[in-house]
Design a protein with these regions (language model features):
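PEST-like low-complexity, intrinsically disordered acidic/proline/serine-rich tracts
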Residues: 1-161
Length: 161
């Protein structure tokens, strides 16, 4: 979930056994088990890694390992893609600061790429806006029509209030 250059909105959901983090960027949905199950075997690798979560007081801690060798250890939308995720451990912490702010902190530990782990912290403000569909449109020819339709729906909804 390391932030990228754009589309950084996210929406978390929680059940008794899982946290799901829906990211606006490419509509990635990360399903994080909270039951302290073991990580997948070392030879099973996934593009988004293998996440496990637990609560540490009021902080959700998510540790993700077992990335593929083709997953960059740092987001390629910010850089050209740095390193290989094969030795990456990503540790994330989510803590609610107040009713409208979630503090997101992540630590990148990838000894094959970096000399030492590094940690970044980002306050994330609550938004009432929807998570938009992530879609690439060839030449954006249809964008004018989609936006016109959305504005018409908003206008109609405002008239009903």
């Amino acid at each position: 979930m390391i932030p990228s250059a754009y589309n950084n909105n996210m929406q978390p959901f929680q059940t008794a056994a899982y946290v799901v983090i829906l990211n606006e960027m490419v509509h990635d949905a990360r399903i994080v088990p909270l039951d302290r199950r073991l990580h997948l075997p070392e030879d099973v690798r996934q593009w988004m890694g293998d996440a496990r979560g637990h609560w540490d007081g009021d902080t959700l801690v998510v540790e993700t390992t077992s990335f593929t060798d083709r997953t960059p250890s740092f987001n390629p939308t910010i850089t050209s893609g740095v390193g290989s995720g094969e030795t990456l451990t990503l540790t994330e912490r989510f803590r609610r600061v107040d009713a409208d702010t979630l503090f997101y902190e992540y630590t990148v530990d990838d000894p094959a790429t970096y000399t030492r782990p590094f940690t970044v912290g980002i306050p994330m403000r609550k938004s009432e806006l929807p998570i938009f569909e992530y879609a690439c449109h060839e030449g954006n020819y249809g964008m004018v029509g989609m936006l016109a339709g959305a504005r018409a729906e908003e206008k109609a909804a405002a008239g009903r209030q």
